[in-house]
């Protein structure tokens, strides 16, 4: 019994041990299985993570590649547009000098390590893929990078363009995006734009909808402009709460330079985005000062308010403020911003001119031509004159370079066939014509008012949306001309050259096609744009409006250079500075004083022309009618101060006055064959002739109908025989 109990006890212990062992091993097997499953699961998750990371990396690299490709395309288009502007070395030098920033040393944060040279910034903000070389890094630039802190911008002048876009609701997205691309290019060239949106389109839409709905439509179009600029790679921002409207009786409204009471109330809301390289876009909406009620206003009032703000003409200060404090405050405002351009993008284009073949003023010297342009616009509605077409028909021909083997008859022969020209908008209703004239008059008045309070260096450009959107795209090939040449963008060309795309003193026939169906090279097609400056007055002695320039009559006193109206010392300085030669004044006076036809002076003797009546050799100077008929109108001196050469349009102003007001029937002159200005003369003359056995080239502007063989021979004889009056006598050798 004892043995049985012992065996039973041992059996239970063994069984328990076996059960425990089995349980233990079972747990081990379960844990091993779980480990295998967990390892497999972890391995699968890692693969998925790696795949996702690889996919994300590929997408990122692809995105970067596409971004670089897009940036290169933008930069290529940008550089081609700049190169297509055809700026000369002098114009490029002037652009760099005018847009040179102040030399400032902004304070550095304490934690910042001293950096001697920063080669990671892009010169002149020309693109993120181009690292600045030493030449680029040291070149003058003022465009501020959006990422640069405000402390680094405090010392630089912001160069600003004020842009008004009229009727954007009539423009498709492609054109609007093109305008945004152009404004982006201007920003990269250093001219950051403030855009004002004008939804007036000549219809009565704003009268058919509520005031609230009209304001919403204006904001919608402003948002389209913001989107178009953003799409070009330059950031824009809608700013709709900076324009205030003064109530009746307020101090602001009483100020004459704040006409209409429209003014800027929150300057920093404008300046903050400008400092960061962001383009503010303003709808033509203002808020009353007292109640902050939103009101739609005219875009021209907004533009003038911004012009006054950027020019430093702010609302009046407190009467208790010290004058010196006010003066310093105004100087600080003017040193912060330079409003260099006023750009009006209008579907109607530039200011019409009834007496020009192309139909538009190319250049307006507002000081001299504003009233004349206004009266012409009111009288004709801007329609082209058929009478002017016939009188300038000969200007269509190319410039002739006469040689000895070409007979005179080859260029005096009249062309057969009359030009047929249809005036622009001749079939429009009187209401439409009145609307066009209203918009043109508003643009003309806006340009004049803005330029009147801006520095003389500021200018204005009025052009069409299509021209503003032109980014130098390739044109389809035309068999009749070189159809693949790039067309200039007038905004970029104007920024780099401070000139219109075409000179205003060119003969009208060379400014564009004679007929709308005539094939013409795109690079020579005239854009319907008008360039304007405040300019300078032009004084003409004697005034051809009251005393037409005619050959001298025996016994009748003639004007002389010693006349009290003429400042002879300043005239002599003008001639000597322009020609870089000393004039033998007494010898010159003896030669010209009895032959002077008239004198043209631009501004404060910045440019001028002296014209005489010359007798061909062999013709007796007896005062007879026959002698007077043989007298030749001769341009004796054409001079522009060196500091005014190549800019400001001084030469064009003088030349245009000469051929338009003084000698519309033609004038001749000569120039040394190696004179670098001959190209300029050649473009403005009707014909040229290299005089045999001399170092002279003859030019003249005489129309074909006024030219005959005797006149041509008289021109040639006079240009060969006139003796120079320089003090060094070197001109005699020519």
Swiss-Prot record:
Gene Ontology biological process: L-arginine biosynthetic process; ornithine biosynthetic process
Residues of the N-acetyltransferase domain: 555-724
Gene Ontology molecular function: L-glutamate N-acetyltransferase activity
Domain of life: Eukaryota
EC number(s) on file: 2.3.1.1
Top-tier EC class: transferase
Gene3D superfamilies given in the database record: 3.40.630.30, Acetylglutamate kinase-like (3.40.1160.10)
Pathway: Amino-acid biosynthesis; L-arginine biosynthesis; N(2)-acetyl-L-ornithine from L-glutamate: step 1/4
Reactions the enzyme catalyzes: L-glutamate + acetyl-CoA = N-acetyl-L-glutamate + CoA + H(+)
Location of the protein in the cell: Mitochondrion
Key words, A-Z: Acyltransferase, Amino-acid biosynthesis, Mitochondrion, Transferase, Transit peptide
Region (Disordered): 384-433
Family, similarity comment: Belongs to the acetyltransferase family.
Protein name: Amino-acid acetyltransferase, mitochondrial
């Amino acid at each position: 019994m004892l043995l049985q109990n012992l065996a039973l006890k041992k059996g239970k212990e063994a069984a328990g041990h076996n059960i425990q062992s089995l349980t233990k091993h079972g747990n081990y097997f379960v844990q091993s299985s779980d480990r295998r499953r967990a390892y497999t699961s972890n391995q699968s998750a890692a693969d998925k993570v790696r795949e996702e990371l690889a996919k994300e990396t590929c997408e990122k690299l692809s995105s970067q590649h596409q971004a670089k490709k897009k940036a290169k395309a933008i930069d290529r288009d940008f550089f081609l547009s700049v190169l297509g502007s055809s700026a000369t070395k002098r114009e490029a030098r002037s652009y760099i000098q005018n847009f040179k920033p102040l030399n400032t040393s902004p304070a550095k944060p304490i934690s910042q390590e001293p950096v001697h040279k920063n080669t990671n910034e892009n010169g002149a903000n020309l693109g993120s893929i181009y690292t600045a070389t030493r030449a680029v890094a040291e070149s003058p630039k003022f465009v501020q990078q959006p990422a640069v802190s405000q402390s680094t911008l405090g010392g630089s002048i912001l160069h600003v363009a004020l842009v008004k876009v009229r009727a954007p609701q009539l423009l498709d997205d492609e054109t609007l995006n093109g305008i945004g691309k152009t404004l982006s290019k201007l920003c990269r060239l250093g001219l950051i734009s403030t855009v004002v949106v004008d939804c007036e389109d000549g219809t009565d839409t704003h009268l058919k909808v509520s005031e609230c709905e009209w304001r919403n439509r204006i904001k919608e179009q402003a948002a389209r402009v913001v989107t178009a600029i953003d799409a070009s790679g330059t950031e824009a921002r809608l700013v709709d709460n900076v324009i205030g409207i003064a109530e009746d009786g307020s101090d602001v409204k009483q100020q004459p330079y704040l006409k209409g009471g429209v003014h800027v109330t929150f300057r920093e809301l404008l300046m903050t985005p400008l400092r960061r390289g962001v383009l503010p876009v303003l709808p033509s909406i203002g808020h009353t000062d007292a109640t902050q009620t939103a009101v739609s206003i005219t875009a021209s009032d907004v533009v003038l308010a911004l012009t006054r703000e950027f020019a430093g003409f702010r609302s009046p200060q407190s009467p208790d403020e010290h004058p010196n404090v006010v003066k310093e405050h105004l100087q600080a405002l003017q040193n912060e911003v330079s409003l260099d351009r006023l750009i009006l993008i209008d579907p109607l284009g530039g200011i019409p001119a009834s007496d020009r073949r192309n139909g538009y003023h190319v250049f307006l010297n507002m000081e001299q031509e504003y009233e004349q342009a206004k009266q012409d616009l009111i009288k004709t509605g801007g329609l082209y004159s058929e009478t002017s077409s016939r009188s300038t028909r000969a200007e269509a021909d190319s410039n002739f370079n006469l040689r000895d083997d070409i007979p005179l008859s080859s260029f005096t022969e009249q062309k057969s066939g009359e030009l047929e020209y249809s005036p622009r908008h001749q079939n429009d209703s009187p209401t439409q014509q009145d609307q066009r004239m209203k918009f043109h008059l508003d643009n003309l008045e806006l340009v004049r008012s803005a330029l009147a309070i801006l520095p003389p260096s500021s200018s204005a450009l009025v052009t069409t949306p299509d021209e503003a959107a032109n980014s130098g795209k390739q044109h389809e090939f035309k068999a009749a001309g070189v159809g693949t040449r790039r067309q200039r963008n007038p905004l970029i060309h104007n920024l780099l050259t401070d000139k219109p795309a075409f000179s205003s003193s060119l003969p009208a026939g060379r400014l564009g096609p004679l007929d709308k169906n005539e094939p013409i090279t795109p690079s020579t097609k005239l854009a319907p744009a008008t360039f304007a400056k405040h300019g300078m007055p032009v004084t003409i002695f004697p005034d051809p409006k009251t005393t037409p320039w005619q050959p001298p009559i025996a016994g009748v006193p003639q004007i002389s250079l010693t006349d009290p109206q003429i400042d002879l010392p300043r005239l002599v300085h003008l001639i000597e500075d322009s020609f870089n030669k000393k004039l033998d004044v007494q010898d010159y006076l003896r030669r010209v004083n009895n032959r002077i036809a008239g004198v043209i002076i631009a501004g404060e003797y910045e440019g001028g022309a002296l014209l005489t009546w010359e007798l061909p050799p062999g013709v007796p100077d007896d005062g007879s009618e026959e002698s007077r008929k043989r007298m030749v109108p001769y341009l004796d001196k054409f001079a522009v101060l060196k500091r005014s050469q190549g800019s400001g349009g001084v030469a064009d102003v003088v030349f245009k006055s000469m051929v338009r007001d003084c000698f519309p029937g033609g004038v001749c002159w000569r120039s040394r064959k190696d004179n670098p200005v001959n190209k300029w003369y050649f473009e403005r003359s009707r014909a040229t002739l290299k005089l045999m056995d001399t170092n002279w080239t003859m030019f003249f502007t005489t129309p074909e109908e006024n030219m005959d063989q005797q006149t041509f021979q008289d021109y040639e004889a006079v240009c060969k025989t006139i003796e120079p009056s320089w003090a060094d006598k070197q001109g005699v050798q020519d």
